[in-house]
Amino acid sequence: MTSRPLAISAGDPAGVGAEIIAKAWRALRQDGPTFVVIGDAQLLASAGGGVKVRAVTRPQEAAQVFPDALPVLDIPVLSPVVYGRPSPSHAPQIIRWIETGVGLALSGAVSGLVTAPIAKAPLYEAGFQFPGHTEFLAELTAAASMVGARGPVMMLAAGDLRATLVTIHTALAKAPSALTTEAIINSGLVTAQALRKDFGIAEPRLAVAALNPHAGEGGALGREEIDIIAPAVEALRALGVQASGPAPADTLFHPEARARYDGVLCMYHDQALIPVKMLDFWGGVNITLGLPIVRTSPDHGTGFDIAGRGIARPDSLIAAIQLAAKIAARRGV
């Protein structure tokens, strides 16, 4: 396992981020992985139910601090925080926490970045221009050199299911027109590359989901399978990827089907998210593939409805931390 800590950006201060980070530290403080939080130290202490917090100035200090206190690179929120009430006034700090984490990961000071949940609406009100975390991280890392196909490609992992998305934060009504053969090929290449490099699968098998019911019924229910998806599958095969499909999505996620592939390429957001959350609602992990840094996050949102009540579960964040550490170790960072 890498000796460098992970970084965790604290997410929206009005949500459950600080609470689940404190709970994750309690669960991992003795056996790791070690991490340093980028956020508001005072908020983390209060949200964590009295958890001991220690401000650090460098990530390298985290290893010594971690068994006894939660190490924090303290960047305070500059406006009042009310749990459950997100505010555009928090946007500068939220963005700075993410930017700081990316900078530390790119410099090698940390082994990877785990991001606590953010809410898009208050960020948009403050002028944020990206559909979500994934696209913002791609922009922040765009100048970094990287070998092979690059992302961002969103993967959701739960148990033995690893599902990647061709269209990410796209309205369902717009997803069909957003599909292109080139996008499917790139997502497939990035996924196959990640399965080899990050998950240790020497010869990954990739299933490709159809868009339409019954894979389009030979064009009767839509031509996307014929005109867009099938050509992408053929191109992936020609490029050396063990790809199969397009297959009807309702046949791809039962246990026997999952045994026949190592990753599944989904055409739109909920085609991947629904089976992942059905399989493991509490423990799913979001991984951004195709970046020059390791990035994971919990597979849930900000939890404004339960923020400040002390009942948020840290399972998904813990899984995200553990998976980020495993990927970093495989990459040797």
Swiss-Prot record:
Matching Pfam families: PdxA
Cofactor stoichiometry and binding remark: Binds 1 divalent metal cation per subunit. Can use ions such as Zn(2+), Mg(2+) or Co(2+).
Binding sites annotated in the UniProt record for a divalent metal cation: 169, 214, 269
GO biological process: pyridoxal phosphate biosynthetic process; pyridoxine biosynthetic process
Pathway info: Cofactor biosynthesis; pyridoxine 5'-phosphate biosynthesis; pyridoxine 5'-phosphate from D-erythrose 4-phosphate: step 4/5
Compartmental location: Cytoplasm
Keyword annotations of the record: Cobalt, Cytoplasm, Magnesium, Metal-binding, NAD, NADP, Oxidoreductase, Pyridoxine biosynthesis, Zinc
Misc note: The active site is located at the dimer interface.
Function according to Swiss-Prot or TrEMBL: Catalyzes the NAD(P)-dependent oxidation of 4-(phosphooxy)-L-threonine (HTP) into 2-amino-3-oxo-4-(phosphooxy)butyric acid which spontaneously decarboxylates to form 3-amino-2-oxopropyl phosphate (AHAP).
Subunit note: Homodimer.
NCBIfam families listed in its UniProt record: pdxA (TIGR00557), PRK05312.1 (NF003699)
Classification via PANTHER family: 4-HYDROXYTHREONINE-4-PHOSPHATE DEHYDROGENASE, D-THREONATE 4-PHOSPHATE DEHYDROGENASE
Record protein name field: 4-hydroxythreonine-4-phosphate dehydrogenase
Origin organism lineage: Bacteria, Pseudomonadati, Pseudomonadota, Alphaproteobacteria, Caulobacterales
